[in-house]
């Protein structure tokens, strides 16, 4: 029996007016702020800027939003949910047991490039919004103001955004409504702009213009938020996202049409640095528009930061990233805070703002990495469709169409590499390297575990328990094991109990944490191996569940006591008569990598890099949420097996299930 600790998807994600409004504030911040800079980038890429060019460019925007965002993500990707959760890592977790082993590398590349390009998002949206003040005062200190906003934004993450987050939906509803109204007001400036709905204008522009790659590089900015749309599936649900997208898309297209019509009507009077977004605003509402743009930019940035925390949390549980400290600033489910990630993103955003200094220069770097993320998602989605036995010809059509489309966008965005795109690519490369090393080193370490059948040691463990000549180490000893088989035990654990220094106790527990492919699983089973002596507990956690082992184990013990499976009473009569409970000690086996261990050349490189990265991780004790006062860490050498080739908040309940066999 499996339990998902979210309420049912139908309850959480039921289509409602309030759900749609909330979705606007969570999902569409990134894609919703694109009108701030897309048309400005298109005007700058045009040579010359004329009627045909603008109609063709707006046509490219409309059909990019239709094909890339609507068809791929809203209609197809949102159906590839992992128990209601979305995003590239959730998708990988869904298919990894049924796909090729190297698919993990696609997930690593996709997650790394998504985060790398995401560093630009807060910077470009905030800068674009603040630059509207230059209409009033050309000498406005945009960079210092943007730095102040970004600093405050990252600072408040540690306190949670539950209270102000309730305003995000209504504010984004106002923002999108403003976009649509402003655009509709100016379509009349040049009615033939409606010809942009004909895709032939887009095709004609791209096939006749030798600088098509510059145009597509600018056009692609309109859909950079599509991947975030998929990642936020678990927060809002498919029905609310699809319904709200219909409204968002209409408002976006109206705004792009209005900006395009205004540009054509004033094509002879365009000046360098002009932003059509602010140009279509009546002068009397310009200040209001700038304020709304700034608010929308902050909401978009907040969504990205929260999404980054979620991605890193998933990456940790999927063994892609070293364990980091995770905090829960509010009682809202899924709202977490990772100090290391928050500080890293803040520093990178500050560096990006100081390096580029303007949204115009930032546009030249934005979008390159996210095209790679989209390509990786396409490959994983194709694998998902294959596993689900969708018609092979439809799957092949999906693969060909979107790999072709995204490859064209990638080639177009490669023109940005020397203009700043290298910044995000460098960051993505560093993250890919860390994830690759961490995942493979973890795999190597786990492959070297020497497995024994614990049944062969039942008698000696019982004898140690009853041997009063051996000093009792603790009443209860809990060993964390990486093995999930019912009778499997690590040789190093047996060595710790029997050989190193006999670990006498009244009860021994083998606790195995099994991370599941589903996001929110929280369950356990108990097997009594030796009555009143040795127990095995398999604790299954979804990849979005933080391993608060101390709290979950305490609850499991309480359940066992309630079921008369276990007694907490001290074995010492003098303490038992005063109802003093026996103590618990957790023993963690830390396998130390030695340079003398025999590995292949590739494995040695990976393990050497792992040793360096290992300094960044949280200690085993803290990462598992254990109390340091009752934890013993035993360091043992990481040895190659003989047969190997040389070279503070409310915590959800964890539900017990009946064992249905061995779990590996």
What function would you assign to each model-found segment?
Residues 2-664:
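The structured alpha-helical core of multi-pass membrane proteins
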């Amino acid at each position: 029996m499996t339990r998902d600790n979210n309420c049912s998807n139908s309850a959480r994600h039921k289509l409602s007016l309030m759900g749609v409004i909330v979705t606007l504030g969570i999902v569409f911040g990134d894609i919703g702020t694109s009108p701030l800079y897309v048309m400005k980038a298109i005007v700058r890429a045009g040579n010359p800027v004329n009627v045909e060019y603008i109609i063709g460019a707006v046509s490219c925007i409309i059909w990019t939003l239709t094909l890339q965002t609507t068809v791929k993500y809203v209609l197809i990707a949102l159906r590839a949910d992992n128990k209601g959760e979305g995003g590239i890592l959730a998708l990988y977790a869904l298919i990894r047991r049924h796909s090729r082993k190297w698919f993990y590398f696609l997930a690593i590349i996709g997650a790394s490039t998504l985060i790398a390009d995401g560093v630009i998002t807060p910077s470009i949206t905030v800068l674009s919004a603040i630059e509207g003040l230059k209409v009033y005062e050309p000498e406005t200190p945009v960079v210092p103001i943007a730095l102040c906003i970004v600093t405050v934004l990252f600072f408040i993450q540690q306190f949670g955004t539950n209270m102000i987050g309730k305003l995000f939906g209504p504010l984004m509803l106002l923002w999108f409504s403003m976009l649509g109204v402003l655009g509709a007001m100016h379509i009349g400036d040049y009615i033939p702009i409606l010809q942009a709905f004909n895709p032939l204008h887009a095709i004609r522009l791209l096939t006749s213009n030798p600088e098509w790659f510059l145009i597509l590089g600018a056009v692609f900015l309109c859909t950079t938020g599509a991947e975030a749309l998929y990642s936020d599936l678990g927060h809002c649900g498919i029905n609310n996202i699809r319904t709200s997208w219909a409204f968002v898309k209409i408002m976006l297209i109206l705004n792009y049409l209005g900006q395009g019509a205004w540009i054509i009507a004033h094509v002879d009077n365009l000046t360098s640095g002009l932003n059509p977004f602010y140009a279509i605003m009546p002068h009397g509402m310009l200040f209001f528009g700038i304020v709304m743009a700034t608010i929308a930019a902050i909401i978009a940035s907040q969504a990205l930061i929260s999404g980054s925390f979620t991605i890193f949390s998933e990456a940790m549980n999927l063994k892609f990233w070293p364990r980091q400290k995770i905090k829960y600033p509010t009682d809202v489910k899924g709202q977490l805070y990772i100090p290391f990630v928050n500080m890293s993103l803040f520093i990178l955003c500050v560096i990006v703002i100081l390096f580029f200094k303007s949204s115009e220069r930032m546009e030249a770097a934005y979008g390159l990495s996210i095209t790679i993320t989209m390509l990786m998602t396409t490959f994983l989605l194709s694998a998902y469709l294959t596993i689900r036995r969708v018609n092979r010809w439809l799957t092949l059509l999906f693969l060909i169409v979107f790999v072709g489309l995204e490859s064209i966008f990638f080639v177009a965005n490669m023109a940005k590499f020397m203009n700043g795109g290298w910044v995000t690519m460098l960051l993505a490369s560093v993250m890919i390297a860390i994830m690759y090393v961490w995942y493979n080193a973890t795999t190597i370490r786990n492959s070297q575990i020497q497995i024994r059948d614990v049944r062969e040691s039942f008698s000696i463990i019982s004898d140690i328990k009853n041997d009063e000549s051996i000093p009792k180490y603790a009443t209860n000893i809990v060993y964390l094991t990486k093995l999930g088989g019912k009778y499997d035990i690590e040789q190093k654990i047996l060595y710790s109990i029997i050989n190193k220094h006999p670990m006498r106790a009244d009860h021994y527990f083998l606790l195995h944490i099994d991370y599941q492919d589903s996001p929110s699983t929280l369950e356990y089973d108990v097997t009594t191996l030796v009555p009143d002596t040795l127990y095995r507990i398999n604790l299954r956690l979804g990849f979005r569940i933080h391993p608060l082992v101390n709290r979950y184990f305490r609850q499991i013990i309480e359940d066992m006591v309630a079921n008369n499976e276990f007694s907490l009473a001290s074995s010492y009569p003098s303490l038992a008569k005063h109802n003093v409970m026996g103590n618990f000690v957790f023993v963690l086996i830390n396998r130390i990598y030695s340079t003398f261990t025999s590995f292949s050349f590739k494995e040695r490189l990976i393990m050497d890099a792992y040793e360096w990265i290992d300094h960044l991780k949280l200690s085993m004790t803290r990462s598992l949420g254990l109390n340091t006062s009752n934890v013993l860490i035993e360091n043992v050498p990481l040895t190659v097996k003989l047969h190997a080739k040389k070279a503070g908040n409310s915590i959800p309940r964890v539900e017990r299930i009946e064992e249905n066999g061995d779990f590996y």
